[in-house]
């Protein structure tokens, strides 16, 4: 099956200029004023090549710079129509093509892909109704739950601003941030086990981490979290093996996936949701909006709904992997809403914004990002996924700007009443299409709409009962933040895994230059398990001085919540 519609090229390939005309000289020849003389400014072939070379690089991703990916096919195996009216989740057997990108988080594009770091796992599905993205990680939790902390957290994971050394040489700022923000302990407990060094991209899982809200045709809300689980199970490397590969084979994971697909293997993942009703959310021990917590499977079991099959390598890495742009805004299609998770709320802005910086204002017009119902090139040719299958042609009023090469032709850039230019309105939760959009809106129509929205908000706002319309607020630390990571360390990890965990932490934290930070690392883990803190102190060669959470906060706090 040829998902992306590649055609065999039958025409001769002729070396040409950028204008398409053949170049009649040797590609390595330059115009000189005389043999062994200076070159001429009129040599536009040379100038064109040098100018193009000078502009080959685009800004690398500020996070998730190191990565690779491939094409895929999604299939819906079980309908979710009872909890969402989102079109791709309705009919069993529905299939669509897509693309996936795997990555590390903190490192630059040249760093090893086996480094101890979360893995980004982002999917783009080319549905008939538009592009649908999942922007996930291979860990079900994250380091923080306050969106404002994300930029400074990433700063701490990158190079020291004075020495310009990264965490392979100096881990001081890495641990300084983490130990001053103890909500990170769950992610760290997960990541410094062997789960932090997956054996391959095809043998690791992916999680939304965030809670989303699915809405069904009756308007009922259901909180969901997505899980994408490898069909082969979760396979890991030891920390020592991952470190060895970082030096001997820094592109290990990329090589492995490329070779698997080249050899005809088609790794598969199974897709699940956990569901939580609003009533369950009000009784849940933790906030449904807390990115540092998981939902226990006993209370909220996995419900399968689909499969993802990795199908083939891309034709050009830059065009399809470097230029692909994911965003959680594309997760929130009709039938799926964002939760009040502040990190998710910030990502809704940050992801499209960074793509505009990295790729330009019209990044969504690039072939790899263009929806099928906007004439996506990947849906042409002999592909079974054609633009003609789309139920409607997508139109909006966004126009012009740099590199705009799909500018909607003669379509009006406003709500028009001219012949053959009337926009249709499609009800998001059914197949109704009407002429609802008009240039004139009566005040009474607006009032009816506002009342309906207020009623929906009252019915669906289950978690946050705001008394004022703004709070300056920092999530505080409490004993609850240590319950789940403590269970992970004490009950899930066996004795051998606990030894490896200590080994991994000590090998990483021993590169801390500041003795105060090194001491704090031992107390940080001591809050999780006192014996763990003590053995890490022994490994780091620092005195063991246990403190409770209140003492830890008093010793290391730098400011009040406001």
Curated annotation (Swiss-Prot):
Gene3D superfamilies in alphabetical order: Catalase core domain
GO MF, one example: heme binding
Stored PROSITE patterns: CATALASE_1, CATALASE_2, CATALASE_3
Please name the catalytic residues of this protein.
64, 137
Give its localization: Cytoplasm
Q: Has UniProt tagged this entry with the keyword Iron?
A: yes
- Which UniProt key words apply to this protein? Cytoplasm, Heme, Hydrogen peroxide, Iron, Metal-binding, Oxidoreductase, Peroxidase
**Annotated GO biological process:** hydrogen peroxide catabolic process; response to hydrogen peroxide
The coenzyme or cofactor needed here is: heme
> Chief localization class?
cytoplasm
Q: Which GO terms describe its cellular component?
A: mitochondrion; peroxisome
| UniProt-annotated binding residues for heme | 351
Q: Name one Pfam family in it.
A: Catalase
Return the EC number. 1.11.1.6
Q: Is Cell membrane given among the entry's keywords?
A: no
Task: Report further notes.
Answer: This is one of two catalases in S.cerevisiae; the other is catalase A, which is the peroxisomal form.
PANTHER family linked: CATALASE, CATALASE T
Quaternary structure?
Homotetramer.
What is known about what this protein does? Occurs in almost all aerobically respiring organisms and serves to protect cells from the toxic effects of hydrogen peroxide.
Tell me the protein family, please. Belongs to the catalase family.
Could you identify this protein by its name?
Answer: Catalase T
Q: Name its species.
A: Saccharomyces cerevisiae (strain YJM789) (Baker's yeast)
User: What's the encoding gene here?
Assistant: CTT1
């Amino acid at each position: 099956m040829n998902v992306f519609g590649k055609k065999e090229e039958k025409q001769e390939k002729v070396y040409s200029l950028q204008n398409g005309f053949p170049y009649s000289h040797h590609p390595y020849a330059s115009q000189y004023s005389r043999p062994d003389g200076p070159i001429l400014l009129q040599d536009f072939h040379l100038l064109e090549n040098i100018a193009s070379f000078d502009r080959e690089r685009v800004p690398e991703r500020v996070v998730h710079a190191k990565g690779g990916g491939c094409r895929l096919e999604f299939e819906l195996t079980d309908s979710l129509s009872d909890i969402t009216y989102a079109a791709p989740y309705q009919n069993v057997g529905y299939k669509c093509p897509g693309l996936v990108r795997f990555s590390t988080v903190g490192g630059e594009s040249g760093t090893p892909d086996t480094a101890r770091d979360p893995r980004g796992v982002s999917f783009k599905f080319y549905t008939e109704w538009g592009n649908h993205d999942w922007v996930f990680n291979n860990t079900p939790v994250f380091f923080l739950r306050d969106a404002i902390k994300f930029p400074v957290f990433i700063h701490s994971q990158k190079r020291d601003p004075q020495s310009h050394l990264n965490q392979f040489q100096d881990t001081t700022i890495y641990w300084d941030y983490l130990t001053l923000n103890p909500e990170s302990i769950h992610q760290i407990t997960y990541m410094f086990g062997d789960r932090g060094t997956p054996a391959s991209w095809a043998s690791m899982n992916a999680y939304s981490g965030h809670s989303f809200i699915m809405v069904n045709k009756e308007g009922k809300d259901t909180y969901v979290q997505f899980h994408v689980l490898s069909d082969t199970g979760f396979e890991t490397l030891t920390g020592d093996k991952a470190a060895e590969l970082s030096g001997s084979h820094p592109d290990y994971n990329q090589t492995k996936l490329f070779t698997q697909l080249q050899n005809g293997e088609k790794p598969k993942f199974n897709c699940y949701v956990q569901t939580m009703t609003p009533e369950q959310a009000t009784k849940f021990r933790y906030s449904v909006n807390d990115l540092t917590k998981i939902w226990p499977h006993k209370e909220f079991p996995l419900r399968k709904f689909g499969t993802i099959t990795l199908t083939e390598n891309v034709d050009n890495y830059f065009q399809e992997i470097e230029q692909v742009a994911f965003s959680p805004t594309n997760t929130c299609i009709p039938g799926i809403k964002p939760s009040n998770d502040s990190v998710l709320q910030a990502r809704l802005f940050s992801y499209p914004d960074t793509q505009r910086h990295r790729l330009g204002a019209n990044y969504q017009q690039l072939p790899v990002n263009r929806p099928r119902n906007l004439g996506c090139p990947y849906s042409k040719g002999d592909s079974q996924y054609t633009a003609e299958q789309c139920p409607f042609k997508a139109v909006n009023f966004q126009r012009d700007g740099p590199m705009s090469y799909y500018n909607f032709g003669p379509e009006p850039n406003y709500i028009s009443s001219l012949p053959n230019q009337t926009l249709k309105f499609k009800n998001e939760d059914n197949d109704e299409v009407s002429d609802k959009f008009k240039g004139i809106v009566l005040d009474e129509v607006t009032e009816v709409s506002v009342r309906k929205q207020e009623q929906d908000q009252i019915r669906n706002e289950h978690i946050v009962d705001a008394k004022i319309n703004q709070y300056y607020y920092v999530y505080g630390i409490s004993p609850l933040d240590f319950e789940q990571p403590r269970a992970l360390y004490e009950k899930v990890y066996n004795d051998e895994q606990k030894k490896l965990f200590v080994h991994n932490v000590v090998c990483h934290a021993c590169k801390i230059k500041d003795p105060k930070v090194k001491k704090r690392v031992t107390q940080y883990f001591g809050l999780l398990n006192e014996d763990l803190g003590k053995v890490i102190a022994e490994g780091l060669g620092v005195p063991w001085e246990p403190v409770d959470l209140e003492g830890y906060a008093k010793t290391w706090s730098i400011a009040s919540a406001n």
